[in-house]
Amino acid sequence: IEEIPRSFQEKGDVVYDGRNVLKRIGLGSIDVVVKSFKKPHIINRVVYSFFRQSKAERSYIYSMEIQQHGFDTPEPVAMIEQFQSGLLSHSYYICCYDGGETVRSLMDGKVEGNEDKLSAFARYTAALHQAGILHLDYSPGNILIHQNDANEYSFSLVDVNRMQLLSDIDC
């Protein structure tokens, strides 16, 4: 894990390359996903260094919170922050690889044939909100779906650095 900042560019398979870069990397006997967050601009470098948790740290903490509430998210492994001249320069979030597919296919407008999946997704979404978990980037690419041998569906949240935990009063 300590080698990730030095070897990130050369190792692993790119899963996503946009504002941030996600790579699947083998670490011993497990595969992990490493999310390299874009280098923040100077104002956010100051903010993340002194006033607010970095996106990597929030991802790690929120993943544990989600699990404590009884919901799935890929198992958090670590987060890494690098500082240059006392300011955050790069950060990485590492979690176990989850082979689930995103729910994008459910959002294509086709209800017929997807009734069971859509019902399960609606129940899952309601349960998240009842538990006070508000994912502020609840887009189809950030929700993974799994189907077990009994044809039951479960879901897993990813990209959780923008999340809010509500109190019972707020729910």
Where are these regions (language model features)?
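Conserved ATP-binding subdomain of kinase catalytic cores across diverse folds
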Residues: 2-102, 120-131
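Active-site-proximal flexible loops/turns
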Residues: 42, 82-85, 103, 144-149, ...
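Short alpha-helix boundary/capping segments
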Residues: 51-54, 113, 170-171
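Short alpha-helical scaffold element within the canonical Hanks-type protein kinase domain
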Residues: 114-118
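Conserved catalytic-core element of eukaryotic-like protein kinases
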Residues: 134
